Amino acid sequence: MAQLYFYYSAMNAGKSTSLLQSSYNYRERGMNTLVMTASIDDRYGKGKVASRIGIESDAQVFSSHDNLIEMITAAHQENHLSCVLVDECQFLSKEQVKQLTYIVDKIDIPVLCYGLRTDFQGELFSGSHYLLAWADKLVELKTICHCGRKANMVVRLDGEGKVMREGEQVAIGGNESYESVCRKHFREFIWD
């Protein structure tokens, strides 16, 4: 039976690396996968999933308005899919997460989603909210804070490296813009 997985973490925990490894494992066994990523995140080029350690893969992009059932079933008809892997899944809409449950429940294709749980203010992203509610399996990938504790929060940095407390929920960036921290340090930076 196929299941919907949500692999979540703060930044720099290896989400994209894990996704690429999972896709490779399927393909190594002669199975087809569909790697997808949000069109909003083009840090490594449009239609690319890339890891900080240097591995990458082409990916089909989706926007918040795309119908994932149509996209995935078209790919499945072309290349019998054994697995769908979604990077940057925090950018999925509620309806798209519901569509992924359809892919799992009705078409019987496993879907592995990888993304952030919360934004730089500690608030859930829409995609993460519904994946936490509806996924069959929740898996936390871990990274560490500068103090050595588990980092489960993210802070946004301005151009001078200072923590920002306000701003739009989505601002695409990497290590120059974000830092993963433990809740204790998040509290000091944001809440206190």
From Swiss-Prot:
This is Thymidine kinase. Belongs to the thymidine kinase family. One of its GO terms (cellular component) is cytosol. PROSITE patterns: TK_CELLULAR_TYPE (PS00603). It comes from Shewanella oneidensis (strain ATCC 700550 / JCM 31522 / CIP 106686 / LMG 19005 / NCIMB 14063 / MR-1). It is found in: Cytoplasm. Its main location: cytoplasm. Transmembrane segments: none annotated. One of its GO terms (molecular function) is zinc ion binding. InterPro entries: P-loop_NTPase, Thymidine_kinase, Thymidine_kinase_CS. Its EC number is 2.7.1.21. ATP binds at S9, A10, M11, N12, A13, G14, K15, S16, D87, E88, C89, Q90. Homotetramer. Keywords: ATP-binding, Cytoplasm, DNA synthesis, Kinase, Metal-binding, Nucleotide-binding, Transferase, Zinc. The active site is at E88. One of its GO terms (biological process) is DNA biosynthetic process. SUPFAM superfamilies: Glucocorticoid receptor-like (DNA-binding domain), P-loop containing nucleoside triphosphate hydrolases. It catalyses: thymidine + ATP = dTMP + ADP + H(+). Zn(2+) binds at C145, C147, C182, H185.
